[in-house]
């Protein structure tokens, strides 16, 4: 009697089916993980802008996105160069700074795009500052293709 060497075709097909089922479950979970990590990353990058805004306001300067010759304005460092308004982050399509001049209240907003996951592209993350210096993170995923609440970074509320 000959001893069997190797696997039968049925055994190999079962292994391939199991691998396919595991991949079908794991891939969407991985995509969700990527989306959550990207929104969290952009929120963290905007947090660096919050610190720069607070420092500029403390010094009596107006925060801006690009370098200006005026000594009363301070670049907060979210753009790629001193003369550009293009975001440093490859996940952001745009970054905007509004307010801050009169009473210290204002917003820093970033729209996700470029290299961001397709499910979260066009999501807007906003850091809002009150006149008291309190910051609030808000996120608006209504323009994104498949935005889910679980993509919200910790501490960000739905806009």
From Swiss-Prot:
Membrane topology: Single-pass membrane protein
Keyword terms of this UniProt record: Disulfide bond, Fimbrium, Membrane, Methylation, Transmembrane, Transmembrane helix
Locations listed in the record: Fimbrium; Membrane
Propeptide residue intervals: 1-6
Keyword Membrane listed: yes
N-methylphenylalanine modification, residue list: 7
UniProt biased composition (Polar residues): 67-87
Annotated S-S bridges: 137-156
Main location: other
Protein name: Type IV major alpha-pilin
Organism: Moraxella bovis
């Amino acid at each position: 009697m000959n001893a069997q060497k190797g696997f039968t075709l049925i055994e190999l097909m079962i292994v391939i089916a199991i691998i396919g089922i595991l991949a079908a479950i794991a891939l969407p979970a991985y995509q969700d993980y990527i989306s959550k990590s990207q929104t969290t990353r952009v929120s963290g990058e905007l947090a660096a802008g919050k610190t720069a805004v607070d420092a500029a306001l403390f010094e009596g300067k107006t925060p801006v996105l690009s370098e200006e010759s005026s000594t009363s304005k301070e670049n907060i460092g979210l753009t790629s160069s001193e003369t550009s308004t293009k975001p440093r982050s490859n996940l952001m399509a745009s970054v905007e700074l509004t307010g801050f001049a009169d009473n210290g209240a204002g917003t820093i907003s970033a729209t996700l795009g470029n290299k961001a996951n397709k499910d979260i592209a066009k999501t807007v993350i906003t850091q809002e500052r009150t006149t008291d210096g309190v910051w609030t993170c808000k996120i608006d995923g209504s323009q994104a293709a498949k935005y889910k609440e679980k993509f919200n970074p910790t501490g960000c509320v739905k806009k």
